[in-house]
Amino acid sequence: MHRRTFLKYGSAGLFTLGMGGFLRHAYSQTAPQDESLLRDRVDPCFDNSPRVAPFTVPLAFAPVIDAVGAVQLTEARGEHVFVPGFRTPIWGYEGMFPGPTLVARRNVPVAVTFTNALPPGEDPSGIIIPNNSRQDPVDHPFRDSTTVVHLHGINTDGQLGPGGDGSFSSDGYPEGALALKNPGESRTHQYPNNGTPGQAAPIYQRPATLWYHDHSVHITSVHLYRGLSGFYVLKDVAEEASGLPGSAAADPGRGIEAGPLGFDVPLVVKDVMLAPEEIDGRPPGTLIYNNCSHFGAFGDLMTVNGKQQPFFEVANRKYRFRLLNGSDSRQYLFAFRVAQNLKSGPNEPFRYIGTDQGLLFTGVPEITTFFHANISERHEFVLDFSKYPIGTRIVMVNLLVDQNDERLFPIMEFRVTRVEADHSQADAWPAAAWAHPADVQPAAITRTFRFNRQGGYWSINSMQFDPLRDDAQPLLDTTEDWVLVNESGGWGHPVHIHLGRFKIMKIQGRAPNPGELTGFKDTVWVGPNQTITVRHQFWNFPGRFVFHCHNGSHEDSDMMSQFNVLPNPGTVGTGTLPGGTPS
């Protein structure tokens, strides 16, 4: 197929304006209210990826690394089989997607050394980009294979520079000292997993499901789409003693490390597009990246842990799942249905137990029948298969697409195939074990940030990202209320704030989703005509960090700002500090 023919295919699927962002539901409902308003109205810009029938291939698991002491990871080109019969060139940590799952322990430091072994330049053979996928309003020194690793959700150092460009670097800072600009370069990231090295109790960092990924300026979207991401699961003694499925107390040796035999299961959901035949000399199965004129890269092939719509054989007992929305731009409304009632429902009830920053701080689950998964969010839930006869099939579905769309509606299938004893519980956990003074600290100030579009670019407070400008200067070991405003009627933004965690204080324009008011977060969905107030914690580390829309195409088009955590003279005042728009 020639490029001209491909572009013809691509334009046929262009979207109608907007994306379902009005989540009008309460916990434990049988079905969403006004479900038609939730539909994902952005069709893939290409809809001819090769595929097999849903639930043909088994769920796959990334290798698990015990992250204690020193860990080495190499960013490399590799091949991956999303669909049987097609070998897709990817970029990945250790050349695989998803990258290895790192399992770390709270208050036990780990040093992870990342080495860039990616091909120099653009590596055009590994991806097809039918349009100008990037806008570069400012010059930057990065090549297309430059990388900067971010451990998403970690509380870690902001003073790792200055780099060659004179800026300080924090974990994931898109420009600065930790950039791997040339093949063969290595950088070591120090993760104390507690807040600060040698920190006395109480420890700040909560056990949680985090993830590591590339964060290079203007090319994050393409790099994540190629495969540069992996899980980082942080555990601790209290959680292991909780009796949750896969914990040491309930299921010794049957946690994440046990892979398909474990009862603590990581799932990364990601949509991609693959070339159905040779295009511009590139083989069938090559990744196609089309960000729909900077609105977002949507795929027509649903994958879980890198496999198209897989099945997972389970025992008739409880399982804990840790789900990451690893898509570039697609959001999901997940529900679970018995296979024979796939289209008619009802949705099966389940326990929702955790958000981005760990288990719910209430210490008890929420019973619900669905949850909204925003880009880059993590969700933890427990499915109890003991109530289903052997042979039952349960399907995870996405309610934001047409239920007749076999490509996008069914996500994966759980098959109840065997009997196993269950010594786990999922009704309570010791939330007090992770309490910290920051969690009850009042806000020192309120700032407002408006997420909009200015001069053809995505922007925050009508400004694009500038590493030489601080848009907020919070004081160290304080909290602030940030009002995140989206006045557009057509697009939503998953807003991610680096460094710490936040609590959602107020939601205007929609009802809360499961866990949003009972769990700590680092990413929040700010949909069209919505305003979300979050209380963010700027604890333990001074320095420069960023916050941004986590729709990769928006982020790369400079919907990102920078804050600089300043040393605290010892008093926390009120009023107006530099940066942001005071409220």
List the model feature ranges, each with a label.
Residues R134-S242, G363-V364, T369-F414, G489-G490, ...:
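Extracellular/periplasmic metallocenter environments
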Residues V338-L359, S488-T518, G552-E555, N564-P569:
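Active/binding-pocket-proximal capping segment
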Residues R3-P174, S186, L287-F321, G358-T362, ...:
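N-terminal, post-signal-peptide metal-ligating segments of extracellular/periplasmic oxidoreductases
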Residues R447-I504, D522-R544, H548:
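C-terminal substrate/ligand-recognition segments
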Residues L73, V112, V149, D214, ...:
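Divalent metal-coordination and catalytic microenvironments
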Residues T115-P119, L324-S329, V485-G490:
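Short solvent-exposed strand-capping/beta-turn motif centered on an Asx-Ser/Thr pair
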Residues T156-A179, V269, M273-A433, P512:
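Histidine- and aromatic-rich segments of cupredoxin/plastocyanin-like copper-binding domains
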